[in-house]
Amino acid sequence: GYNLQEHTQWAKFTNYNTSTQVPLIIYNPLSKVRGSTDALVSLIDLYPTIIDLCDLKEPEKQLDGISLKPILKNPQLEGKSYVFIKKENGFTLKTKDFSYTEFIKPKDNSIITRMLFDHRTDKAENFNVAGHSDYENIISELNFILHSNFQENIEGK
């Protein structure tokens, strides 16, 4: 995860998978379920998961994450349909199949450029397909999700 010259980058300061994906291991000594999952989750889900596993009361309307307890009980569950990642002026929406990033100009919130990677064919994120007409509908859909769910993050509120 340190971008050892992948994408000509060094260290963790990009929106590429090499910077944003981390291994996640959860051990629950009370559970008999063992295994791994490909479920899409986010690190903001850890605190709600710990609260849920310990049967503590969740703070009302304060947590953005969701408990991973259902996935821990059944690793075949899908997890989230997307996760949001922000790194400086890059705003990324990741799904199972795609990684969509918009780089936004802070002064007027205009889009500087976009990146779209199709993880079904390019897990290493080497080929930006944002300019390919075959992906126009995907870009529209991901752009809509990004701006309708995370506009306050984009505008810096």
Enumerate the predicted regions with their spans.
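Histidine-centered active-site microenvironments of extracellular/periplasmic hydrolases
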Residues: G1-K32, S42
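Conserved beta-strand positions that form and line the central face of beta-propeller blades
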Residues: N3, N15, L24, S36, ...
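Conserved hydrophobic "DFG−1" position in protein kinase catalytic cores
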Residues: E6, I26, P70, L93-T95, ...
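C-terminal, low-complexity/hydrophilic appendages and adjacent surface loops
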Residues: A11-T18, I85-G131
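Aromatic-acidic/polar surface patches that form glycan- and anion
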Residues: N15, S36-L43, K57, K61, ...
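Long, internal low-complexity/basic segments
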Residues: Q21, S42, L46, I51, ...
